[in-house]
A protein has these predicted regions:
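Short amphipathic alpha-helical segments
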Residues: 25-28, 75
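N-terminal alpha-helical segment
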Residues: 6-7, 38
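Hydrophobic/aromatic residues within well-ordered alpha-helical segments
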Residues: 17, 21-24
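Enriched for short, Lys/Arg-rich terminal
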Residues: 1-5, 12, 16, 56-59, ...
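A short, surface-exposed loop/turn module that caps and links secondary-structure elements
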Residues: 30-54
Length: 86
């Protein structure tokens, strides 16, 4: 079982997110305890040796793996594409 750590930036970003989504993000992040044997929507970041992306609804949780332990480094909001996007 892995120890998950958060950067100060990631904690600040999590606190600024609407509380309706925070529970879902925390549940998915806690599932990283069993990384790499986890069944989540994960994608390895191209060009980065140890960075991954976890998709949680409209949010992307970026994390890196250091000595086998996930470390949350960033939470990004992804806006939906609409006809006005283009």
């Amino acid at each position: 079982m892995n120890q998950i750590s958060w950067t100060k930036k990631a904690i600040k970003q999590l606190l600024s997110i609407d509380q309706r989504y925070v529970k879902s993000i925390r549940e998915k992040v806690n599932a990283l305890n069993t990384f790499p044997d986890v069944k989540l929507d994960l994608k390895k970041m191209s060009g980065k040796d140890s960075q991954y992306r976890l998709r949680v609804g409209d949010y992307r949780v970026l994390f890196e793996v250091i000595d086998g332990e996930p470390r949350i480094i960033n939470i990004q909001t992804v806006k939906r594409r609409t006809s006005t996007t283009y």
